[in-house]
Amino acid sequence: MREYNKGIFVVLNQGGPFATGDAPPSIAPFSGAGKEWVRGLKQAGLTTKYRILRNQIFEFLGVGSFADINELLNNSDRRGVVEKRAYGLLGNMFGIDGNSREIIARVNEYSRTADGVISYLKGKVLANYASYIEMTNEIDSIKSPVELLLILFDDRYHKKARFEAKRKLVLMNLAASIDQRERETDVENKFLKFLDFLNDHVWSRKTRIGELEIVYLLSKHAPENFACTEVKVIDKKNFKEVTRKPLQKLTLVKRRRFQVNGGEVPIYVSIRKKPPEAKVLKLLRKGEENPAVAVDDELGLMAVMDSVMGVKLFQRHLTRCAGRAGSLLILEEVTDTLDGGDHVSSSIGSSSQTPMFKFFARMGGMRVEFIVHTNVSYINYMYQRDVSHDEYEVKRIFDSGVAEMLFPLDIYGLEMDKIKDRLIHWFRKRIEDS
């Protein structure tokens, strides 16, 4: 599990001095509760962090003390002035070009991304617990960072709402950093350039862009671990004649083709472009504030071939295509476990039992991650016990500590260790019984 006692994440730790309490932070520093809180702050070694955060809050709100914040809560005219100034500060900090309306629109996008992180978890990994983690309506609807920040000090709001306001601010900050990094590195244009390279040089010219061949992978699975023992490719014409038996799965894939030595080789391809909320989640899982961690591996492709020989053909084909496009292609960080051996991954929740051919291709000013499977390894990636992607999604959210950080026990009443085991069991049942 990651340690979230550093950087911006420390403010979400409900076991630390920045925890959201039953009442807002006290503006009376010399009260008994205030003195006890200061002692806890010193014991945690977070005094300097507190001073930095306090100064940032004061500067953002244009106040000189916590008493001024209390006055701001009761003065709507002054809040309007503060909010207008705050958008200007955010625009300059994150390098957002444009007038005030354009800056507000961009910040609103960060708000939608922050809400999207929670919606993604509520709709997928934690779908069985959606009613438990549903966001307070007022927090869901507020987009203004000033309004969200003031809620932290407003006694009218319940503890859960104040925590969610703070959480939303943290997620918005990460979304803004990622957006700034993407603009600096021109990721969007690089992605379009990557697609052009594939369409112009890699895929067969005998098919039109977007033209895909539907086939089905009929796989047999071992009862002890649901590993794939055999797989057959079934074309669309013969699909209706297939009757599945116990321990069999039928998986639809849409394949393209590339040309090698005058022949056409089929390949299933999934091109990765992470949505903003997925990038924020990656920073959370890694316990990182540096947006490069989420952005710099933005470009990626997963491919599935009929055999190991097909995988090697595709790798050589890529190298030749890059040359025809006027660029060398250099393979970096190559991992090949399709012929045996374990894949060593630093990612929390990932399995070393997942065979793959993985590398980063540096070409044409881009660095693209490629993960290439055979039909068998892809089926295992989808369905094998302790390996499947659904299990991996659950494990990395829970084992990294993200679930507990975003939905702490004292606010949501969810015991994450027990929930993790239940969810993995539920996903396994859905995979093996469907």
List where the protein language model places each region:
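Long beta-strand-rich cores associated with HINT superfamily self-processing modules
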Residues: 287-434
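Charge-rich, low-complexity segments
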Residues: 1-294, 397-434
